């Protein structure tokens, strides 16, 4: 793997091990907590906009995010370069967090923390579809091959739909969309600046 993608993967695995077997209280400090006025619960802190992405809800959550990072991260890092890749990933993570905070503020309800690298991963998926639009990707179910641009488009639309319809879900669908939107905004900025030969 490329260096930044590898280090993100290692950090996420380390974060998962720490939160589950060494220091479960990390969730109180590092998970993304919504804005609320309940003194008995942890509250939002600025660093949580990034740190939540290194924690995960369970082993399957970690596995699928790290599998996607392994599949798409190195190709994007090779295209962007390591420094720009890191900036891009962090922007996607933060934009996903902001989308989640807005969604939680609008919907309300009992405050629950958000964890996971999915916002960053969805940003990488978007970048992959733009950089390699005609590469074939396979759906898990049903197992249908399709070009990357179509895979990304359908997946993004599905997440947007679920974000407004699956209100009771434990999956932060609009955070996924937020990661893609943040990634797209940064790519458009780079295109405008003409600093990225591939984008």
PLM feature spans:
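A detector for small-residue-rich transmembrane helices and their helix-helix packing motifs
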Residues: 1-199
